[in-house]
Swiss-Prot record:
Upregulating conditions: By chitin.
UniProt repeat feature LRR, residue ranges: 62-86, 87-110, 112-134, 135-159, 161-183, 184-208, 211-233, 234-258, 260-281, 282-305, 307-329, 330-354, 356-377, 379-401, 403-427, 441-465, 466-489, 491-511, 512-537, 539-557, 558-581, 625-649, 650-673, 674-697, 699-722
Domain of life of the organism encoding this protein: Eukaryota
Subcellular location: Cell membrane
Residue intervals on the Extracellular side: 23-770
Identification of the protein by name: Receptor-like protein 52
Organism field: Arabidopsis thaliana (Mouse-ear cress)
Glycosylation (residues): 47, 64, 74, 93, 109, 124, 233, 246, 260, 295, 304, 389, 422, 429, 455, 464, 485, 525, 571, 581, 656, 704
Consequence of gene loss (knockout): Enhanced susceptibility to pathogen powdery mildew E.cichoracearum.
InterPro entries (UniProt xref): Leu-rich_rpt, Leu-rich_rpt_typical-subtyp, LRR_dom_sf, LRR_N_plant-typ
Length: 811
C-alpha cells in the first residue's frame, strides 16, 4: 500500500522544472544574506513571495543567480560568510561601500567567479599570500582605493586568467612582484598612486604582458631608466602612464613606435636627452612629456600626429623653434610649451586649422607677433604668452573671441595700438580706458588688470560678470567712484593705488562670499564701514591712505585676520571691549597653512597680496598665509586708552598703533599676545611703565616705544636688550639696564659703553616677502590679463599631479 504513494510523489517531483528548485534555494540563501547585511532598506523588495531573478541587484542565467551587484549601497561591517553560497555566481561587485577588515578570504569559496570588485572600501591589512586561491577562472580583480598595506603577494601572478588587475591608490609600503609579468592574458594593469612602494625599477618581466592595452603606473616610486625590453612586444598597448615617478635616462624609441598607442604620460620625472625624432605612433591623442629635463628641439615628426589633441612639453630645456607643422594638426586642442628655451616666431598657422582651446608658451625666448588666428576655431579659452620677446600689435581677434577667459601678455615688447571690439585703444603700456569688451566675457572668473596705466572710470558693466571671483584693478590711474552691484560671487576685490573717490558702495554688503577687500591709497571719503561686519567670510580689510574719518564704536568682524586702516582721519576712543568679537585672532586652531587666494576658481593660479608695515618697514607680502594676522591703526587721531581686550588676540603677529593720540598705560594684557612679532606704539601720549610681561614674548623681535611719556625701568629680557636706541627715543624718564647697555647716546649719565650692533633680522618663516620700502622700486607693468590671471603664475601641472585619479564615487 505504501509503494503507490511514494511512486506518485517521485513522479510529481521529477515533473517540476529544475530552475524552480534553484530559484527556491537561491531565494532562501539571498534572504539569509540580506539578514547578514542588517536588512538594509535598499533590499526591501527582497521577499519570500517573488522570484529572486526579479529582485534589484540580482542577475540570473537559466534561473540561477550569476551576478550580485552591491555597488554604492553604503553597506558596512565585514563581508558576510554567506556571500558565496551561490554555486553559479560569476560576478560580485561590492565596490563603493564601507566594508572593513582584512581581505575577505571567504571569497575563496566563490569558485566560479570571473569578476570581483572590492574597490573603494575600507579594507586594510596585507593581502594574503595565498590570494591565488581565488576562483581559477577569475578575469577581473579590482582591489583599488582601500587601505591594504605591506607587499603585494607574488602569488597574485598565479591567477592565470586575469585580464584586469587594479590595485591603485592604497597604502602598500612594501614591493609589488615581478610575477605580475606571468599574467599572460592581462590587458589592463593599474598600480598607480601608491607612493609608499619601495623604490624599484620597472620590472623587465612586465615585458611578457604581450596582450596589455592599458598601463597606469603613475606615482608609485619607480626609479632608474625605462627599459625598452618592457615595451618592445606590447603591440596592443593603447595607454601608458608612468608620470610622477623618479625615472631617469632617455625616452626609449620603442614607446614612439607603438602603433596602437593613443595616450602617453611621462610627466614629472627626471628624464633627459632628446625627444625621439622618429614617431610612428600615429594614433597618439595625448602626449605629455612635461616637467622633465629634456633638451634638444621639438621633433618635426610630431606634426604627423594628425589625431593629437593634447601636447604638453612644458618645463623642460627644449631649444629651437616651434615646428610649423604643429600649427597644422587638425585636432589640436591644448598646446602647452611654457618654461623652455624656445626661440623664433610662433607659427602663424596655430589655431587656424584646429579648434584650439589652450595656448601656453610663456617663459621662453619667442619673438615676432602673436598669430592672428588663435581663435579661428571659436573655442579658445586661454592665451598665456608672458615673459617672451614678442612684439607688434595684439590681434583684434582676441577681443572678438567670446570663449576667451584667460590672457597673460605681460613682460613682452608689444607696441602700437589695437582696436578691440569697440574701438578701445590699448598698447603695450596698456594706457587708456579699460576695454568694455571684457564685460562680454560671461564666463570670466578672474580679472586682473593690475600694475598698468589704465585711466578713466571702472566700467559699470563689470556688474554683468556673474561668475567673477577675483577683481584686481590695483596700481592704475583709475578715477571716479566704485561701481555698485559688483557680482555677488566675488571673493577678492583689490582696487588699491588708484584715484578713486566717493564712498564705499553699500551694495558690497550683498557679497556674502567676500574674503578680501583692498581699497588702499585712493581718495575715498567715508566713515568706517561698520556695515561690513555682516560679511561672515571677510578676512582681509585694507582701507589705508584714504580720507576715511569719524569714530569706530562697534566692530563685529569675527573672521577678520588682517585689518589696515592706517593713514586716515579716524578719531575718538576705542571701547574697552573693542576686540571682543575678533575671534579669528583668538585661536586659529589646527588649520593647514596655505596661501590666500589659492582656493579661488578651484585652481592654484592666483594668490592675494597686500602691503603691510612690519618692523617699521613697508613690505609687500606677495602671498598671504592664512595664519598671518595683523592690525594697523597707525596714522590716525585715536585718543584714550588702548583697549584691554587686545590681550584676547593670542594669534596676533603684528600690532601697529603708532602716530595717534593714545593715552594711559600699555595694558598688561598685551603679555598674552604669545605670537606677537612686531609692536609699534610710537608717537602717542602713552605714559607709565612698559609692562614687564612684554619681555616674556619670545617671538617679539621688533618694538618701538619712542616719542611717548614712558617712565621707569625698561624690562629686562633679550628682546629689549637687542632693540636699537631709536625704539626708546624721546622718553626722557626711561632708564634701566637695557638702556644702559644699548642707548648711551640717550642717557648720558650711564657709563660709556660701546653701542651694540643692530642684529640682522631673522628670515621670516611664516611669510614669503618681497621686501621694499614703498616707492623705492618702480612698478612693473604686467599687462592686460583676463580669466585665470595672476600676479605669480603657477602652472596647473604643479597643483594637479593627481589628475589621473579617475575613480570617484558614483552618483
Amino acid at each position: 500500500m505504501t509503494f503507490l504513494p511514494l511512486l506518485f510523489i517521485f513522479f510529481f517531483l521529477t515533473s517540476i522544472p529544475f530552475p524552480a528548485f534553484s530559484q527556491y534555494n537561491d531565494r532562501s540563501t539571498l534572504l539569509n544574506l540580506k539578514r547578514d547585511l542588517g536588512d538594509p532598506l535598499s533590499l526591501r523588495l527582497w521577499n519570500d513571495t517573488s522570484s529572486p531573478c526579479n529582485w534589484p541587484r540580482i542577475t540570473c542565467t537559466a534561473g540561477n543567480v550569476t551576478e550580485i551587484n552591491f555597488q554604492n549601497q553604503n553597506f558596512t561591517g565585514t563581508v558576510p560568510t554567506t556571500i558565496c553560497n551561490f554555486p553559479n555566481l560569476k560576478s560580485l561587485n561590492l565596490s563603493f561601500n564601507y566594508f572593513a577588515g582584512e581581505f575577505p578570504t571567504v571569497l575563496y569559496n566563490c569558485t566560479k567567479l570571473q569578476y570581483l570588485d572590492l574597490s573603494q572600501n575600507l579594507f586594510n591589512g596585507s593581502l594574503p599570500d595565498d590570494i591565488n586561491r581565488l576562483a581559477p577562472k577569475l578575469k577581473y580583480l579590482d582591489l583599488a582605493a582601500n587601505s591594504f598595506a605591506g607587499d603585494i603577494p607574488k602569488n597574485i601572478g598565479r591567477i592565470s586568467k586575469l585580464k584586469v588587475l587594479n590595485l591603485y591608490m592604497s597604502e602598500y609600503d612594501g614591493t609589488f612582484p615581478s610575477e605580475i609579468g606571468d599574467l599572460s592574458e592581462l590587458e589592463e594593469l593599474q598600480l598607480a598612486l601608491n607612493d609608499k612602494f619601495t623604490p624599484v625599477k620597472l620590472p623587465t618581466e612586465f615585458g611578457k604582458l604581450k596582450k596589455l592595452k592599458y598601463m597606469w603606473l603613475e606615482e608609485m616610486n619607480l626609479i632608474g631608466e625605462i627599459s625598452a625590453v618592457v615595451f618592445e612586444n606590447m603591440t596592443d598597448l593603447k595607454h601608458v602612464d608612468l608620470s610622477v615617478n623618479n625615472l631617469t635616462g632617455r625616452i626609449p624609441d620603442v614607446l614612439f613606435g607603438l602603433k596602437n598607442l593613443t595616450e602617453l604620460y611621462l610627466f614629472a620625472n627626471d628624464l633627459t636627452g632628446e625627444i625621439p625624432k622618429s614617431i610612428s605612433a600615429k594614433n597618439l591623442v595625448h602626449l605629455d612629456l612635461s616637467a622633465n629635463n629634456l633638451n634638444g628641439s621639438i621633433p618635426e615628426s610630431i606634426g604627423n600626429l594628425t589625431n593629437l589633441e593634447l601636447l604638453y612639453l612644458f618645463v623642460n630645456e627644449l631649444t629651437g623653434e616651434i615646428p610649423r607643422a604643429i600649427g597644422k594638426l587638425p585636432e589640436l586642442k591644448e598646446l602647452k610649451l611654457f618654461t623652455n628655451k624656445l626661440t623664433g616666431e610662433i607659427p602663424a598657422e596655430i589655431g587656424f586649422i584646429s579648434k584650439l582651446e589652450r595656448f601656453e608658451v610663456s617663459e621662453n625666448q619667442l619673438t615676432g607677433k602673436l598669430p592672428e588666428n588663435l581663435c579661428h576655431g571659436g573655442k579658445l579659452q586661454s592665451v598665456i604668452v608672458y615673459s617672451n620677446n614678442l612684439t607688434g600689435e595684439i590681434p583684434e581677434s582676441l577681443g572678438d573671441c567670446e570663449t576667451l577667459s584667460s590672457v597673460l601678455l605681460q613682460n613682452n615688447g608689444f607696441s602700437g595700438s589695437v582696436t578691440i571690439s569697440n574701438n578701445t585703444r590699448s598698447n603695450n603700456n596698456f594706457t587708456g580706458k579699460i576695454p568694455s569688451f571684457i564685460c562680454e566675457l560671461h564666463s570670466l572668473i578672474l580679472l586682473d588688470l593690475s600694475t598698468n596705466k589704465f585711466n578713466g572710470s571702472i566700467p559699470r558693466c563689470i556688474a554683468n560678470l556673474s561668475t567673477l571671483e577675483v577683481l584686481n584693478l590695483g596700481k592704475n590711474h583709475l578715477s571716479g567712484s566704485i561701481p555698485e552691484n559688483i557680482s555677488t560671487s566675488v571673493k577678492s576685490i583689490d582696487i588699491g593705488h588708484n584715484q578713486l573717490a566717493g564712498k564705499l558702495p553699500r551694495s558690497l554688503v550683498r557679497i556674502s562670499s567676500l574674503e578680501v577687500l583692498n581699497v588702499e591709497s585712493n581718495k575715498i571719503n567715508d566713515t568706517f564701514p561698520f556695515w561690513l561686519d555682516s560679511m561672515q567670510q571677510l578676512q582681509v580689510l585694507v582701507l589705508r591712505s584714504n580720507a576715511f574719518h569719524g569714530s569706530i564704536n562697534q566692530n563685529g568682524f569675527s573672521k577678520l585676520r588682517i585689518i589696515d586702516i592706517s593713514g586716515n582721519h579716524f578719531n575718538g576712543t576705542l571701547p574697552l571691549d573693542f576686540f571682543v568679537n575678533w575671534t579669528a585672532m583668538f585661536s586659529l586652531g589646527k588649520i593647514e597653512d596655505q596661501y590666500m587666494g589659492t582656493n579661488y576658481m578651484r585652481t592654484n593660479y592666483y594668490s592675494d597680496s597686500i602691503v603691510v608695515m612690519i618692523k617699521g618697514i613697508a613690505l609687500e607680502m606677495v602671498r598671504i598665509l592664512n595664519t598671518f594676522t595683523t592690525i594697523d591703526f597707525s596714522g590716525n587721531k585715536f585718543e584714550g586708552e588702548i583697549p584691554r581686550s587686545v590681550g584676547l588676540l593670542k594669534e596676533l603677529h603684528v600690532l601697529n598703533l603708532s602716530n595717534n593720540g593714545f593715552t594711559g598705560h600699555i595694558p598688561s594684557s598685551m603679555g598674552n599676545l604669545i605670537e606677537l612679532e612686531s609692536l609699534d606704539v610710537s608717537q602717542n601720549k602713552l605714559s607709565g611703565e612698559i609692562p614687564p610681561e612684554l619681555g616674556k614674548l619670545s617671538y617679539l623681535a621688533y618694538m618701538n616705544f619712542s616719542q611717548n611719556q614712558f617712565v621707569g625701568l625698561v624690562p629686562g629680557g633679550t628682546q629689549f636688550q637687542t632693540q636699537p636706541c631709536s625704539s626708546f627715543a624721546d622718553n626722557p624718564r626711561l632708564f634701566g639696564l637695557s638702556l644702559e647697555r644699548v642707548c648711551v647716546d640717550i642717557h648720558k649719565k650711564t657709563p660709556q659703553q660701546s653701542e651694540m650692533p643692530e642684529p640682522e633680522e631673522d628670515e621670516e618663516e611664516v611669510m614669503n616677502w618681497t621686501a621694499a620700502a614703498i616707492g623705492s622700486i618702480p612698478g612693473i607693468s604686467i599687462g592686460l590679463t583676463m580669466g585665470y590671471i595672476l600676479v605669480s603664475y603657477k602652472p596647473e601641472w604643479l597643483m594637479n599631479s593627481g589628475r589621473n585619479k579617475r575613480r570617484i564615487k558614483p552618483i
